[in-house]
Amino acid sequence: MLAKRLVPCLDVKDGKVVKGVQFRNHEIVGDIVPLAARYAEEGADELVFYDITASAHERVVDKSWVSRVAEQIDIPFCVAGGIKTISQARELLAFGADKISINSPALTDPSLISRLQDEFGRQCIVIGIDSFFDATSNSYKVKQFTGDEAATKDTQWFTQDWVEEVQKRGCGEIVLNVMNQDGVRGGYDIKQLSLVRAICDVPLIASGGAGTMAHFRDVFIEAKVDAALAASVFHKAIINIGELKAYLAAEGIAIRR
């Protein structure tokens, strides 16, 4: 059995790490490089950095801090934000990122997924999916440009259909960002993650809702995800990564120590 991964997420805006609730009202929580170094020291398995306004503002993630992070940490990290071309992806990988993640640009141009996979291999192509439960239609729908509240828009895609589409096009991993749960620390959306797990043949990373150590245990056991991503519980030192790993190991979950 492959060990489960713990992945702190750092949302970046204007050169600072920020955190919102349900993708709104972002507040500054710290500086990029010191936070990255802290999580690596605590035992994070990898890190994810989202430049949350890059796509909405028609720009690419700032490479200057990517190289500084690469110099400071010795664990893999993934970078996302406005990546729309092979050359942009190549540059970020050259600056030290191990993986690149695309979200809104893939919705605009799904062929980008297969082109990136052909160039770099599927192992470093991650697809982020911002999924919103629409109570009116009782369905899960994909949203786009979610890093800027004013720019956020609905797409034509139901979440399960988009999950299948991105796999056909060659993604190596999927991060499912459950918008309704984001930042509220009420637990991961086990129901939705389980539905996606059933149709997902690539590694699936749960995102949105972590509030206690038990939430991590539950998402690994019940939704059978490969990794759990979290932000506010780590930023605010509610949960220490080393202590979380000890807890999960004691609960019988295979975890990297």
Swiss-Prot record:
Keywords: Amino-acid biosynthesis, Cytoplasm, Histidine biosynthesis, Lyase. GO terms for biological process: L-histidine biosynthetic process. Disulfide bonds: none annotated. It catalyses: 5-[(5-phospho-1-deoxy-D-ribulos-1-ylimino)methylamino]-1-(5-phospho-beta-D-ribosyl)imidazole-4-carboxamide + L-glutamine = D-erythro-1-(imidazol-4-yl)glycerol 3-phosphate + 5-amino-1-(5-phospho-beta-D-ribosyl)imidazole-4-carboxamide + L-glutamate + H(+). It is found in: Cytoplasm. It is an enzyme of class 4 (lyase). Belongs to the HisA/HisF family. Heterodimer of HisH and HisF. This is Imidazole glycerol phosphate synthase subunit HisF.
